[in-house]
Each structure stands twice: as C-alpha cells, then as structure tokens.
C-alpha cells in the first residue's frame, strides 16, 4: 500500500474531525448567520467589508468543510482504485462523500431559507456518519497492508446485540444532544443530574428537551458498561473487542463529565467543544466495532465462566 495514501487518509480523517468540531463551534457561538443569508459567499462578497468574530467562525467552517469535501472525494477515488477489491471500500467511499455533501446542503439551506431546530439537529449526526465512514476507510487502508490487522474474531449473539444496538441507540443520543444545542436548552436545567433541586420533573419544553437528553445519555452509559463487563468476562483473548469496549466506556464517561461541566460552567466554550469531540470519538470506535461484527462469523454462545477460545490470526480480506 502506498505510504502517501496512508498519510492522505489520516489527514482526511483529521480534517473531518475539524468539520465536526467547527460545526459545534458555529452552533455554540451562534455564528450560523455570521455571513448573512448568503452562501457560499459572505454577504454576497468574496471579501466582506465588515469583519466580525461570527463571520470569521462561519466562513472558516465553510472553508474547512469545502476543503474536507475535496479531500474526501480524492480519498474515495484513490481507495476505490487501490483497494476496490475489499468489499467495504466502495460502500464506505460512497457514504463518506454523499453524507458530507448532504450535511453541506442542509447547512446551506439553513442559511438561505432557514430550517427548524428539529431539522438542524440532524446536521451534526449526518456529519458524524461521514466522519465515521472516512475513519473506517482509513483503518481499512492500514488493515489491507497487514497493519492494525486484528485477529479473526468469533462473536456470540449477545455481543452482536450490544454492538448493533448501541451504535443505533447512540445516534438517537447524538440527535437529542444536537437538539439541546439548537433549541438553546443547554442551560434550561440549572442543576445536575436532576433539572432542579426543588422538583423531580421538568415543567416546560426546554427542560423536557434537556432532561430527555440526560435520560438518553444515562441509558447509553449503562448499556456500554454492561457490554464492557461482558467483553471483560469473555473476550480478553480478543484484544480488539476487549479494548474497544474499554475505550468506549472511558469515552462515554468523559462525555458524561463534560456534559455536567457544561451546566456547571454555564456553557464554557472549551468544555462544550470537548463534549462534541468525545462523542465523535465514541461514535468512531463504535463504528469500528460494527465493521468487525459485520466481518466476523457467529460462534456458539459462551458458557458462563468460560473465556473465548483463541483463534488464529488472519488478515482481513
């Protein structure tokens, strides 16, 4: 595998991460209209006359997104040519580019015509799918060259249930978090983990949005913890699964801590961006576990108290 392709794939993955964080920055700083109702230009000008912080943030996000789109397109073409024989290459290439274009169109439509908060909450999730596809494509590039090549795996039905269920549910959690941001409900509840110390239940829309996200987040934390315990009991001999869940648990706990700190610090910008960063990384790890699950054969359920048998090493094909 060409070394240049590895470097380019890694750089493209980082660029996509900047797109995600940049989008969160635009939302957190309320810079979505920094360029007015003009797209792709700012206020209909190549070089705007009145430079404001919101304009700089919005324009920078557009430039980074445009550059990332070009890089993703090049990566798709190169990976298609070099490793088109790998069955996941073409679907991942299509997903990465199509969803990146889709999120750009939604962003442009929001600027020019405006969109509801419920539609705009999809924006981050769509970008997240594109990021995950690029990340998996990058990992495949290294795997094909027999680096980062995991052992051949056998997953029982319970582990498959955790992998499939958690990644689908995590997307719901991402949507509720994005809805919190777009409805300006981040500080609707001044207390944590309850909405207010004086009462148990929310009483108005923004509080329900905030508490709905907290409840969804609590469920995924517990679910990932359960999956991690299962991996620790039966998959220690398969490090890619065992450590994948350990990392997922650490990331979701970091997500919980930064979520609480967002409330306690009253929307500190750096903590808010860290919150977006951790969920992006978590979704990436879960996506890799999904890829592994789709590639592996099923094995009989593990008997209680027994560990998974060692399996022979084999490169992914």
Curated annotation (Swiss-Prot):
Q: Which superkingdom, per the lineage?
A: Bacteria
The molecular function GO annotations come to: metal ion binding; oxidoreductase activity, acting on NAD(P)H, heme protein as acceptor
What this protein needs as a cofactor is: heme b
Ligand binding (heme b): 213, 275
**Segments on the Cytoplasmic side according to the record's topology features:** 1-6, 76-91, 145-159, 236-243, 294-317
What biological processes does GO assign it? heme A biosynthetic process
Annotated compartments: Cell membrane
Binding positions for heme o per the UniProt entry: 61, 123
Q: Which classification does the entry list for the species?
A: Bacteria, Bacillati, Bacillota, Bacilli, Bacillales
Which UniProt key words apply to this protein? Answer: Cell membrane, Disulfide bond, Heme biosynthesis, Iron, Membrane, Metal-binding, Oxidoreductase, Transmembrane, Transmembrane helix
Instruction: Please describe what this protein does.
Output: Catalyzes the conversion of heme O to heme A by two successive hydroxylations of the methyl group at C8. The first hydroxylation forms heme I, the second hydroxylation results in an unstable dihydroxymethyl group, which spontaneously dehydrates, resulting in the formyl group of heme A.
According to UniProt, the reaction catalysed is: Fe(II)-heme o + 2 A + H2O = Fe(II)-heme a + 2 AH2
Tell me the disulfide pairings in this chain.
35-42, 189-195
A single GO cellular-component term from the record reads: plasma membrane
Membrane-spanning regions, if any? 7-27, 55-75, 92-112, 124-144, 160-180, 215-235, 244-264, 273-293
Extracellular topological domain: 28-54, 113-123, 181-214, 265-272
Report quaternary structure and partners: Interacts with CtaB.
Membrane-topology descriptor? Multi-pass membrane protein
Designated name of the protein? Heme A synthase
Q: Which family does it belong to?
A: Belongs to the COX15/CtaA family. Type 1 subfamily.
Q: Does the keyword GTP-binding apply?
A: no
**KW NADP (keyword) present:** no
Could you give the domain comment from the record? The N-half (TM1-TM4) and C-half (TM5-TM8) domains are connected by an intracellular loop. Each domain is formed from four-helix bundles and they align in a pseudo twofold symmetry manner. The N-half domain is the substrate-heme O binding domain and the C-half domain is the cofactor heme B binding domain.
Task: Describe which pathway this protein belongs to, using the record's wording.
Answer: Porphyrin-containing compound metabolism; heme A biosynthesis; heme A from heme O: step 1/1
> Where do the catalytic residues lie?
58
């Amino acid at each position: 595998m060409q070394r240049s392709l590895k470097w380019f794939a890694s750089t493209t993955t980082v660029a996509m991460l900047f797109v995600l964080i940049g989008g969160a920055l635009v939302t957190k700083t309320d810079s979505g209209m920094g360029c007015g109702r003009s797209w792709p230009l700012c206020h209909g000008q190549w070089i705007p006359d009145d430079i404001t912080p919101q304009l700089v943030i919005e324009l920078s996000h557009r430039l980074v997104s445009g550059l990332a789109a070009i890089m993703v397109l090049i990566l798709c073409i190169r990976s298609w040519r070099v490793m088109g024989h790998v069955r996941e290459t073409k679907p991942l290439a299509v997903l990465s580019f199509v969803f990146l274009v889709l999120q750009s169109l939604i962003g442009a439509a929001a600027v020019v015509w405006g969109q509801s908060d419920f539609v705009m909450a999809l924006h981050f999730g769509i970008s997240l799918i594109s990021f995950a596809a690029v990340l998996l494509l990058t990992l495949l590039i290294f795997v094909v060259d027999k680096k980062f090549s995991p052992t051949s795996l056998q997953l029982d039905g319970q582990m498959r249930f955790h992998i499939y269920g958690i990644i689908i549910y995590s997307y719901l959690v991402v949507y509720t978090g994005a809805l919190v941001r777009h409805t300006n409900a981040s500080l609707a509840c001044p207390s944590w983990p309850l909405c207010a110390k004086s009462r148990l239940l929310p009483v108005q829309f923004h509080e329900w949005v905030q508490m709905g996200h907290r409840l969804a987040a609590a469920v995924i934390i517990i679910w990932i913890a359960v999956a991690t315990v299962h991996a620790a009991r039966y998959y220690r001999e398969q490090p890619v699964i065992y450590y994948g869940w350990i990392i997922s648990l650490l990331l979701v706990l970091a997500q919980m801590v930064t979520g609480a700190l967002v409330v306690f610090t009253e929307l500190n910008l750096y903590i808010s961006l860290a919150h977006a960063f951790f969920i992006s990384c978590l979704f990436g790890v879960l996506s890799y576990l999904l890829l592994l699950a789709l590639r592996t054969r099923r094995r009989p359920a593990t008997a209680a108290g027994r560990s998974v048998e060692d399996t022979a090493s084999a490169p992914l094909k």
